[in-house]
A protein has these predicted regions:
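A short, proline-enriched helix->beta-strand linker immediately N-terminal to the Walker B motif
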Residues: 153-157
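Catalytic Walker B motif of ABC-type/P-loop ATPase nucleotide-binding domains
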Residues: 159-162
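Conserved beta-strand-loop-alpha-helix hinge in the C-terminal portion
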Residues: 201-202, 214-244, 248
Length: 307
Protein backbone atom coordinates (compact mmCIF):
# COMPACT_ATOMS: atom_id res chain seq x y z
CA UNK A 1 0.00 0.00 0.00
CA UNK A 2 2.80 2.44 0.93
CA UNK A 3 6.20 2.11 -0.74
CA UNK A 4 9.28 4.27 -0.31
CA UNK A 5 12.00 3.09 -2.71
CA UNK A 6 15.47 4.63 -2.41
CA UNK A 7 13.91 7.91 -1.28
CA UNK A 8 16.15 10.86 -0.47
CA UNK A 9 15.13 14.42 0.30
CA UNK A 10 17.45 17.42 0.16
CA UNK A 11 15.90 20.84 0.74
CA UNK A 12 16.82 23.92 -1.29
CA UNK A 13 19.08 25.17 1.50
CA UNK A 14 21.14 22.00 1.27
CA UNK A 15 19.69 20.27 4.33
CA UNK A 16 19.68 16.50 3.87
CA UNK A 17 16.50 15.27 5.54
CA UNK A 18 16.24 11.68 4.28
CA UNK A 19 18.82 9.43 2.70
CA UNK A 20 18.05 6.31 0.65
CA UNK A 21 14.97 5.32 2.64
CA UNK A 22 13.28 2.03 1.77
CA UNK A 23 10.02 1.29 3.58
CA UNK A 24 7.03 -0.87 2.68
CA UNK A 25 3.84 -0.72 4.73
CA UNK A 26 1.05 -3.17 3.94
CA UNK A 27 -2.63 -2.38 4.04
CA UNK A 28 -3.97 -2.80 7.55
CA UNK A 29 -0.64 -2.43 9.36
CA UNK A 30 -0.15 -0.40 12.53
CA UNK A 31 3.32 1.15 12.50
CA UNK A 32 5.12 3.38 14.98
CA UNK A 33 7.75 5.77 13.59
CA UNK A 34 10.21 6.98 16.22
CA UNK A 35 13.34 9.07 16.25
CA UNK A 36 14.97 12.05 17.90
CA UNK A 37 14.39 15.63 16.81
CA UNK A 38 15.91 16.11 13.38
CA UNK A 39 15.81 12.41 12.56
CA UNK A 40 13.62 12.95 9.49
CA UNK A 41 10.18 12.13 10.89
CA UNK A 42 8.55 15.39 9.78
CA UNK A 43 9.93 15.08 6.27
CA UNK A 44 8.74 11.48 6.11
CA UNK A 45 5.21 12.64 6.94
CA UNK A 46 5.31 15.57 4.51
CA UNK A 47 6.33 13.22 1.72
CA UNK A 48 3.48 10.84 2.55
CA UNK A 49 0.99 13.71 2.53
CA UNK A 50 2.51 15.07 -0.68
CA UNK A 51 3.44 18.36 0.92
CA UNK A 52 6.95 17.67 -0.37
CA UNK A 53 8.29 15.58 -3.24
CA UNK A 54 11.40 13.39 -3.05
CA UNK A 55 14.69 14.61 -4.46
CA UNK A 56 15.28 11.08 -5.69
CA UNK A 57 13.57 7.73 -5.45
CA UNK A 58 9.88 6.91 -5.72
CA UNK A 59 6.94 7.02 -3.31
CA UNK A 60 3.83 5.02 -4.16
CA UNK A 61 0.68 5.09 -2.03
CA UNK A 62 -2.42 3.21 -3.23
CA UNK A 63 -1.13 3.20 -6.82
CA UNK A 64 -0.46 6.94 -6.73
CA UNK A 65 3.10 7.87 -7.71
CA UNK A 66 3.50 10.92 -5.50
CA UNK A 67 6.56 12.30 -7.24
CA UNK A 68 4.83 12.36 -10.63
CA UNK A 69 1.39 13.36 -9.40
CA UNK A 70 -0.16 16.38 -11.09
CA UNK A 71 -1.16 19.14 -8.73
CA UNK A 72 -4.84 18.88 -9.60
CA UNK A 73 -4.81 15.24 -8.44
CA UNK A 74 -3.46 16.01 -4.98
CA UNK A 75 -6.86 16.80 -3.38
CA UNK A 76 -8.27 13.47 -4.53
CA UNK A 77 -5.25 11.56 -3.28
CA UNK A 78 -5.49 13.25 0.13
CA UNK A 79 -9.05 12.06 0.58
CA UNK A 80 -7.48 8.67 1.33
CA UNK A 81 -5.76 10.16 4.37
CA UNK A 82 -6.97 11.04 7.85
CA UNK A 83 -4.55 13.36 9.65
CA UNK A 84 -4.23 13.73 13.43
CA UNK A 85 -2.06 16.66 14.51
CA UNK A 86 -0.25 17.17 17.79
CA UNK A 87 -1.61 20.70 18.09
CA UNK A 88 -5.20 19.66 17.32
CA UNK A 89 -5.91 22.35 14.65
CA UNK A 90 -9.50 22.82 15.77
CA UNK A 91 -11.53 25.74 14.46
CA UNK A 92 -12.18 27.86 17.57
CA UNK A 93 -15.58 29.25 16.64
CA UNK A 94 -17.06 25.85 15.79
CA UNK A 95 -18.52 23.30 18.19
CA UNK A 96 -17.20 19.76 18.50
CA UNK A 97 -19.97 18.59 16.19
CA UNK A 98 -19.24 21.24 13.57
CA UNK A 99 -15.47 20.72 13.69
CA UNK A 100 -16.01 17.07 12.82
CA UNK A 101 -18.79 17.76 10.33
CA UNK A 102 -16.63 20.36 8.61
CA UNK A 103 -14.26 17.64 7.38
CA UNK A 104 -17.19 15.97 5.60
CA UNK A 105 -18.61 19.21 4.22
CA UNK A 106 -15.29 20.12 2.63
CA UNK A 107 -15.31 16.97 0.50
CA UNK A 108 -18.93 17.47 -0.54
CA UNK A 109 -20.76 14.96 1.65
CA UNK A 110 -24.54 15.21 1.85
CA UNK A 111 -26.03 16.71 4.99
CA UNK A 112 -28.10 13.61 5.71
CA UNK A 113 -24.89 11.54 5.68
CA UNK A 114 -23.23 14.08 7.94
CA UNK A 115 -26.10 13.90 10.42
CA UNK A 116 -25.68 10.10 10.62
CA UNK A 117 -21.93 9.78 10.56
CA UNK A 118 -20.78 12.63 12.81
CA UNK A 119 -22.69 11.63 15.99
CA UNK A 120 -21.49 8.05 15.53
CA UNK A 121 -17.83 9.06 15.32
CA UNK A 122 -18.14 11.53 18.20
CA UNK A 123 -19.56 8.68 20.28
CA UNK A 124 -16.62 6.44 19.33
CA UNK A 125 -14.18 8.93 20.83
CA UNK A 126 -16.35 9.34 23.92
CA UNK A 127 -17.46 12.94 23.42
CA UNK A 128 -21.20 12.69 22.79
CA UNK A 129 -21.82 14.77 25.91
CA UNK A 130 -19.51 17.50 24.56
CA UNK A 131 -20.89 17.72 21.03
CA UNK A 132 -22.13 21.30 21.49
CA UNK A 133 -19.07 22.55 23.33
CA UNK A 134 -16.42 24.78 21.78
CA UNK A 135 -12.69 23.96 21.76
CA UNK A 136 -11.89 26.43 24.55
CA UNK A 137 -14.32 24.52 26.77
CA UNK A 138 -12.43 21.24 26.36
CA UNK A 139 -9.37 19.77 28.03
CA UNK A 140 -6.30 18.99 25.95
CA UNK A 141 -7.22 15.32 25.87
CA UNK A 142 -10.75 16.11 24.74
CA UNK A 143 -9.45 18.38 21.99
CA UNK A 144 -7.22 15.58 20.73
CA UNK A 145 -10.23 13.26 20.67
CA UNK A 146 -12.04 15.77 18.46
CA UNK A 147 -9.02 15.84 16.16
CA UNK A 148 -9.11 12.05 16.02
CA UNK A 149 -12.85 12.03 15.26
CA UNK A 150 -12.24 14.47 12.43
CA UNK A 151 -9.61 12.14 10.96
CA UNK A 152 -11.99 9.16 11.20
CA UNK A 153 -15.16 10.72 9.89
CA UNK A 154 -14.49 10.31 6.16
CA UNK A 155 -13.51 6.63 6.46
CA UNK A 156 -9.94 7.26 5.36
CA UNK A 157 -7.92 4.24 4.27
CA UNK A 158 -4.81 5.57 6.01
CA UNK A 159 -4.59 7.39 9.34
CA UNK A 160 -1.43 9.43 9.89
CA UNK A 161 -1.02 10.52 13.50
CA UNK A 162 1.70 13.11 14.06
CA UNK A 163 2.69 13.06 17.75
CA UNK A 164 -0.98 12.64 18.78
CA UNK A 165 -0.04 12.14 22.43
CA UNK A 166 2.38 15.04 22.69
CA UNK A 167 0.02 17.40 24.50
CA UNK A 168 -1.91 15.01 26.73
CA UNK A 169 -1.27 13.13 29.98
CA UNK A 170 -0.06 9.49 30.09
CA UNK A 171 -3.51 8.02 30.70
CA UNK A 172 -5.03 9.92 27.80
CA UNK A 173 -2.03 8.97 25.65
CA UNK A 174 -2.78 5.30 26.24
CA UNK A 175 -6.45 5.80 25.40
CA UNK A 176 -5.62 7.62 22.16
CA UNK A 177 -3.38 4.78 21.01
CA UNK A 178 -6.07 2.28 21.95
CA UNK A 179 -8.56 4.19 19.83
CA UNK A 180 -6.15 4.06 16.91
CA UNK A 181 -5.63 0.33 17.45
CA UNK A 182 -9.37 -0.35 17.51
CA UNK A 183 -9.63 1.51 14.24
CA UNK A 184 -6.73 -0.50 12.86
CA UNK A 185 -8.59 -3.71 13.71
CA UNK A 186 -11.19 -2.76 11.10
CA UNK A 187 -8.53 -2.75 8.36
CA UNK A 188 -7.42 0.87 8.39
CA UNK A 189 -3.68 1.43 8.02
CA UNK A 190 -2.31 3.50 10.91
CA UNK A 191 1.05 5.27 11.00
CA UNK A 192 1.86 6.96 14.28
CA UNK A 193 4.89 9.22 14.67
CA UNK A 194 5.93 9.62 18.28
CA UNK A 195 8.83 10.22 20.64
CA UNK A 196 6.92 8.54 23.51
CA UNK A 197 9.13 5.46 23.75
CA UNK A 198 7.54 4.20 26.96
CA UNK A 199 4.20 4.17 25.15
CA UNK A 200 5.63 2.30 22.17
CA UNK A 201 6.98 -0.41 24.47
CA UNK A 202 3.45 -1.23 25.63
CA UNK A 203 2.37 -2.51 22.22
CA UNK A 204 3.51 -5.40 20.05
CA UNK A 205 3.67 -3.49 16.80
CA UNK A 206 6.17 -2.78 14.09
CA UNK A 207 8.52 0.10 14.86
CA UNK A 208 10.52 2.09 12.30
CA UNK A 209 13.43 4.02 13.80
CA UNK A 210 14.81 7.04 11.95
CA UNK A 211 18.15 8.62 12.79
CA UNK A 212 19.96 11.23 10.73
CA UNK A 213 17.53 10.73 7.86
CA UNK A 214 18.17 6.99 7.65
CA UNK A 215 16.19 3.94 8.73
CA UNK A 216 18.35 2.30 11.39
CA UNK A 217 15.77 -0.22 12.62
CA UNK A 218 12.57 -1.63 11.19
CA UNK A 219 10.87 -4.58 12.78
CA UNK A 220 8.13 -6.00 14.92
CA UNK A 221 8.21 -5.34 18.62
CA UNK A 222 9.92 -8.16 20.51
CA UNK A 223 8.81 -8.84 24.07
CA UNK A 224 7.34 -5.37 24.33
CA UNK A 225 10.21 -3.46 22.69
CA UNK A 226 12.08 -3.24 19.40
CA UNK A 227 15.45 -5.02 19.26
CA UNK A 228 17.67 -3.19 21.74
CA UNK A 229 20.82 -3.82 19.72
CA UNK A 230 19.39 -1.81 16.82
CA UNK A 231 18.24 1.25 18.75
CA UNK A 232 19.83 1.23 22.16
CA UNK A 233 20.39 4.98 22.05
CA UNK A 234 16.63 5.47 22.10
CA UNK A 235 16.33 3.52 25.35
CA UNK A 236 13.79 1.16 23.83
CA UNK A 237 13.89 -1.96 25.96
CA UNK A 238 11.72 -4.94 26.79
CA UNK A 239 8.86 -4.14 29.10
CA UNK A 240 5.85 -6.10 30.21
CA UNK A 241 2.88 -5.17 28.09
CA UNK A 242 0.10 -3.64 30.11
CA UNK A 243 -3.52 -4.38 29.44
CA UNK A 244 -5.00 -2.16 32.11
CA UNK A 245 -7.17 0.84 31.39
CA UNK A 246 -7.83 -0.32 27.85
CA UNK A 247 -10.93 1.20 26.36
CA UNK A 248 -13.38 -1.27 24.91
CA UNK A 249 -15.24 0.88 22.39
CA UNK A 250 -15.54 -1.17 19.22
CA UNK A 251 -15.25 0.34 15.78
CA UNK A 252 -18.28 -1.27 14.22
CA UNK A 253 -19.97 -0.01 11.13
CA UNK A 254 -22.78 2.38 11.83
CA UNK A 255 -25.93 1.87 9.78
CA UNK A 256 -25.68 4.52 7.13
CA UNK A 257 -25.89 5.10 3.44
CA UNK A 258 -22.63 5.36 1.55
CA UNK A 259 -21.82 9.06 1.18
CA UNK A 260 -21.73 10.20 -2.40
CA UNK A 261 -18.21 11.21 -3.35
CA UNK A 262 -18.00 14.16 -5.73
CA UNK A 263 -16.45 13.55 -9.12
CA UNK A 264 -13.33 15.46 -10.04
CA UNK A 265 -15.30 18.16 -11.81
CA UNK A 266 -17.26 18.71 -8.58
CA UNK A 267 -14.21 19.54 -6.46
CA UNK A 268 -14.86 22.10 -3.72
CA UNK A 269 -14.41 25.73 -4.68
CA UNK A 270 -10.72 26.67 -4.49
CA UNK A 271 -11.36 30.07 -2.90
CA UNK A 272 -13.39 28.46 -0.12
CA UNK A 273 -10.72 25.86 0.52
CA UNK A 274 -7.94 28.43 0.64
CA UNK A 275 -9.98 30.36 3.19
CA UNK A 276 -9.88 27.43 5.60
CA UNK A 277 -6.32 26.21 5.07
CA UNK A 278 -4.07 27.38 7.87
CA UNK A 279 -0.83 26.30 9.52
CA UNK A 280 -1.56 27.98 12.83
CA UNK A 281 -4.82 28.60 14.63
CA UNK A 282 -7.06 26.45 12.46
CA UNK A 283 -6.37 22.97 11.20
CA UNK A 284 -5.27 22.30 7.67
CA UNK A 285 -7.72 20.51 5.44
CA UNK A 286 -5.55 18.58 3.05
CA UNK A 287 -7.39 19.76 -0.04
CA UNK A 288 -6.07 22.44 -2.34
CA UNK A 289 -6.03 23.53 -5.95
CA UNK A 290 -3.49 25.00 -8.31
CA UNK A 291 -5.67 27.92 -9.41
CA UNK A 292 -7.12 30.19 -6.80
CA UNK A 293 -7.48 33.78 -5.66
CA UNK A 294 -6.88 34.25 -1.94
CA UNK A 295 -9.96 35.07 0.08
CA UNK A 296 -10.01 37.49 2.97
CA UNK A 297 -9.52 34.69 5.48
CA UNK A 298 -6.54 33.35 3.55
CA UNK A 299 -5.01 36.82 3.30
CA UNK A 300 -5.31 37.20 7.06
CA UNK A 301 -3.21 34.07 7.44
CA UNK A 302 -0.59 35.21 4.90
CA UNK A 303 2.95 34.95 6.08
CA UNK A 304 2.49 31.83 8.22
CA UNK A 305 5.42 29.43 8.18
CA UNK A 306 5.03 26.19 6.31
CA UNK A 307 4.66 23.14 8.48
Amino acid sequence: MIDFKNVSKVYDNGTKALSNVNIHIDKGEFVFVVGASGAGKSTFLKLMMREEVPSSGTITIKDYNLGEMKKRKIPYFRRNLGIVFQDFRLIPNMTVYDNVAFAMRVVGAREKDIRKRVPYVINIVGLSHKARNYPNELSGGEQQRVALARALVNNADIIIADEPTGNVDPQMSLEIVELLKRLNETGTTVIMVTHAHDLVRMFDNRVIVLDGGEVIADGAVEDGGIPVQQASHLNIEAKEKTSENRITQKFVSAPQEEPEQPQEEDAPDADFLNAIISDTDTYRIYVEDDTSAPSAAAENKEGGDAE
